[in-house]
């Protein structure tokens, strides 16, 4: 049996990972026709059909699933090899981290500090996006690690792992005058700034409103927690939701006032990484760190 053309195998692997020829072609900087031709050559070599159409997506046939399983292990090992070579040869380790935009930037910053080794041999690059987009980039080996507000579903994303780092209670704050009314009923008379409905925290908040029988006036929804706080500074009549550790600013920053705590709602923090990154020194630092004193 003659040797396999690994370029053909790689293009097939990318199509399976991306779910379509067009997306794979974009990722490979090739035309869809070129990718299709390469997969056809692989099918001729293996004497069998590797893909089939399912609506607008491409999925592997039974033979394709078998080939993809081995290809996934092969190319996963190749990326792992490159990472290990990179660790041993670079004076500064390049470490690309994706951060879910819904998370508190202050807490994220403190978590990231633990990723930096004592000798500072690291070149940290941070990128913000949604949980879903970051997972896609991690699966494509464009990121080394993710900090997010929800774990990864290993059944949907094989080869990816998550570890819970901690959770923070949530509270409502305002930069304006505070009414001495019972909480949470006081929220009915306020303009609220809350996390976006597509975020994990946004869904938790709305469920809590329903349980409390509240129908508040929502002035704005924000996926970015830092932007929500900045907006609240310039709209002092609004009330915004943030991790409870913000209460430490109430004394130091006199204009910030606590409206009330919500013990039932917790903002969770997870680190997500690929199996090949387990030995990365920065990932190990984060996974091994004790964040007990960081979260309220």
Swiss-Prot record:
It comes from Vibrio cholerae serotype O1 (strain ATCC 39315 / El Tor Inaba N16961). Residues 21-40 bind DNA. This is Transcriptional activator protein NhaR. The keyword Transcription applies. SUPFAM superfamilies: Periplasmic binding protein-like II, Winged helix' DNA-binding domain. It comes from the Bacteria. Pfam families: HTH_1, LysR_substrate. Keywords: Activator, Cytoplasm, DNA-binding, Transcription, Transcription regulation. Signal peptide: none annotated. Residues 1-61 form the HTH lysR-type domain. Belongs to the LysR transcriptional regulatory family. GO terms for molecular function: DNA binding; DNA-binding transcription factor activity. Plays a role in the positive regulation of NhaA. One of its GO terms (biological process) is regulation of DNA-templated transcription initiation. One of its GO terms (cellular component) is cytoplasm. The keyword Transcription applies. Its main location: cytoplasm. It is found in: Cytoplasm.
């Amino acid at each position: 049996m003659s040797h396999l053309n690994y370029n053909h195998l790689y293009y097939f692997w990318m199509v399976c990972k991306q779910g379509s020829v067009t997306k794979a072609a974009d990722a490979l900087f090739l035309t869809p026709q070129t990718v299709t031709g390469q997969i056809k050559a692989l099918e001729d070599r293996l004497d069998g059909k590797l893909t089939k159409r399912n609506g607008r997506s491409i999925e592997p046939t039974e033979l394709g699933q078998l080939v993809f399983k081995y290809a996934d292990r092969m190319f996963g090992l190749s990326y792992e090899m490159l990472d290990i070579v990179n660790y041993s040869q670079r004076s500064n380790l390049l470490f690309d981290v994706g951060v879910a935009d819904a998370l508190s930037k202050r807490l994220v910053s403190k978590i990231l500090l633990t990723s930096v080794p004592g000798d500072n041999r690291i070149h940290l690059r941070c990128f913000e996006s949604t949980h879903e987009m970051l997972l896609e980039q991690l699966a494509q080996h464009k990121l080394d690690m993710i900090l997010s507000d929800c774990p990864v579903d290993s059944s949907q994303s094989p080869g990816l792992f998550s570890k819970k780092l901690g959770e923070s209670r949530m509270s409502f704050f305002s930069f304006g005058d505070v009414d001495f009314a019972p909480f949470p009923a006081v929220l009915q008379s306020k303009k609220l700034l809350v996390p976006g409905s597509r975020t994990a925290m946004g869904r938790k908040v709305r469920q809590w409103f329903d349980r409390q029988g509240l129908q508040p006036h929502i002035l704005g929804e924000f996926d970015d927690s830092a932007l929500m706080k900045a907006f609240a500074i310039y709209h002092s009549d609004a009330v915004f939701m943030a991790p409870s550790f913000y209460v430490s600013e109430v004394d130091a920053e006199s204009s910030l006032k606590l409206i009330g705590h919500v013990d039932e709602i917790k903002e969770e923090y997870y680190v997500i990484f690929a199996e090949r990154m387990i030995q990365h020194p920065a990932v190990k630092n984060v996974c091994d760190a004790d964040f007990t004193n960081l979260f309220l």
